[in-house]
């Protein structure tokens, strides 16, 4: 397992950071050798990392790079999936089909369940049955099916896209009034506002106060 180096911070231009990320991955492939790399795992939007939202071109270029070297792309939709960003899965915003996708959390609406999805080509490699201590729970599975029905019936993707646009506009309006808000980023209802003090340092205390209220 190899972790790519962090190429972004709040003072870095996102476009430049995305380009640096691609170059970093190229360097890893060249250094370690593509034959030693089975797959690359990435979030379409970094959640706990700060709602870091790659530019529109990023995942297409990344997928092309990986395909050239026979490396699979695994997209982690555990936080971003199931209508949160205005589409069923966040990777859809980038018009890329990953080889494998992992999902959980919102799939069960509070019930414990996770799953992975693959392309037909990758699925063909899964030729032997596997065992799981807690897998196949019928209650969680029934809940997941109900969640999917609810998302489609009540058009939650469209709702998240619409409400997210309204919320983002409101946050940007607040940013214009208050220097505390350095940046607003994200897609749909997966949004984040970065708060900083006058010296540019993270406004941790102010963030705590806002969260408490």
Please place each PLM-identified region on the residue numbering.
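Conserved N-terminal phosphate-binding loop of PLP-dependent enzymes in the Aspartate aminotransferase
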Residues: 1-213
